[in-house]
């Protein structure tokens, strides 16, 4: 069976830190590595940051813009140059590429999500390496990915990848930032049971040009491993290490995946959608859902948070506010607020009409990875 690899490279690796100009030697090494993987029989996707950083360099700007409109304009300048460089380098090796620009909107809508999957499948059939970036030019703030670490994990989930490599400016995960704390301990392997107890001073900031930091990489690892994808953090200046890692060398930090048991639709619910609110449940409802595999009934709901409509995604939380599941609701928030705590037989009396007996049917409900661990 053909294996699929997603490789994400960050702005700090793609560009020279002093100037923001493209680090062409690094990009050339990356292109050569990805082409070797493709020739070896892998299906390869590259998630590339850098549009804003390259745009800043092209326009001789010293700082990343904070204004949304300016950021989107500069991304439009940088994306064209970035994809041209990739195309020129891949073309010298005879490897065709495609550009795919995504926003969260494409993953929220089920039909668009399936269309995106089919597009990737067709590109693989054509022998093409897709290059993915967030469509910064049109993404609205509440529907953006926020960083390409998250985007790469969601893409890996979408296409059912086997591996996700995050190429960054450190060689692996450490207990603290090794650039600031010389005694920081390297972490080479993380299994699912250890993930929840991982002690890492991750911080929140990335490089001056990027948007990610180690916090976003750990969030990406949670998405990827929960979806059955093995993830690796390794240094981006040596992309050839990807080949060595695939051959079994202990380079970087590897995150062992959980078994991929959920169907494609449930993975979409779990990772493709943005929760628009929360439902707080009593202990009986939590047990029925998490241990009994039951649907969510109105009687088990204690509190409603957020403003949402039917068919949107929400988080289900226990009495302490911890996420236990997420799913698609059959009622809007104002209706759930009226029927919470009541039996399903009373819905018609409370709302004036009889809708679904369940607030969330079990077919539209996914147990949280945190609750399973």
Swiss-Prot record:
One of its GO terms (biological process) is L-proline biosynthetic process. GO terms for molecular function: ATP binding; glutamate 5-kinase activity; RNA binding. It is found in: Cytoplasm. It is an enzyme of class 2 (transferase). Transmembrane segments: none annotated. Gene3D superfamilies: Acetylglutamate kinase-like, PUA domain. Coiled coil: none annotated. It catalyses: L-glutamate + ATP = L-glutamyl 5-phosphate + ADP. Its EC number is 2.7.2.11. InterPro entries: AceGlu_kinase-like_sf, Asp/Glu/Uridylate_kinase, G5K_ProB, Glu/AcGlu_kinase, Glu_5kinase, Glu_5kinase/COase_Synthase, Glutamate_5-kinase_CS, PUA. Catalyzes the transfer of a phosphate group to glutamate to form L-glutamate 5-phosphate. PANTHER family: GLUTAMATE 5-KINASE. Belongs to the glutamate 5-kinase family. This is Glutamate 5-kinase. It comes from Gloeothece citriformis (strain PCC 7424).
């Amino acid at each position: 069976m053909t294996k699929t690899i997603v490789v994400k490279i960050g702005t700090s690796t793609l560009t020279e830190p002093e100037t923001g100009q493209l680090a062409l030697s690094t990009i050339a090494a990356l292109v050569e590595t990805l082409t070797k993987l493709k020739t070896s029989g892998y299906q390869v996707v590259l998630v590339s940051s850098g549009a804003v950083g390259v745009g800043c360099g092209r326009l001789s700007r010293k700082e990343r813009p904070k204004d949304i409109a300016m950021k989107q304009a500069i991304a439009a300048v940088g994306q064209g140059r970035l994809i041209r460089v990739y195309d020129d380098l891949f073309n010298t090796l005879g490897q065709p590429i495609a550009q795919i620009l995504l926003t969260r909107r494409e993953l929220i809508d089920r039909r668009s999500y399936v269309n995106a999957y089919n597009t990737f499948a067709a590109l693989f059939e054509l022998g093409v390496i897709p290059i993915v970036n967030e469509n910064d030019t049109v993404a609205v703030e509440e529907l953006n990915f926020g960083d390409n670490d998250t985007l790469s994990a969601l893409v890996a989930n979408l296409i059912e990848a086997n591996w996700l490599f995050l190429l960054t400016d450190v060689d692996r995960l450490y207990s603290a930032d090794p650039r600031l704390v010389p005694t920081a301990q390297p972490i080479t392997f993380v299994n699912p049971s250890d993930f929840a107890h991982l002690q890492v001073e991750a911080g929140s900031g990335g490089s001056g040009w990027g948007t990610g930091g180690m916090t976003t990489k750990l969030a990406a690892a949670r998405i990827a491993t929960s979806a059955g994808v093995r993830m690796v953090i390794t240094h981006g200046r040596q992309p050839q290490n990807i080949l060595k890692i695939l051959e079994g060398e202990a380079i970087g930090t590897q995150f062992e995946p959980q078994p991929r048991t959920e169907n494609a639709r449930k993975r979409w619910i779990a990772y493709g959608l943005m929760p628009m609110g929360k439902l707080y449940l009593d202990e009986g409802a939590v047990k029925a859902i998490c241990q009994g595999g039951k649907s969510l009934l109105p009687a088990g709901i204690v509190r409603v948070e957020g403003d949402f409509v039917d068919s949107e995604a929400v988080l289900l939380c226990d009495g302490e506010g911890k996420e236990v599941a997420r799913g698609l609701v059959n009622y809007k928030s104002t209706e759930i607020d009226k029927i919470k705590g009541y039996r399903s037989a009373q819905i018609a009396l409370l709302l004036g009409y009889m809708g679904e007996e369940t607030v969330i049917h079990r077919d539209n409900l996914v147990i949280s990875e945190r609750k399973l661990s």
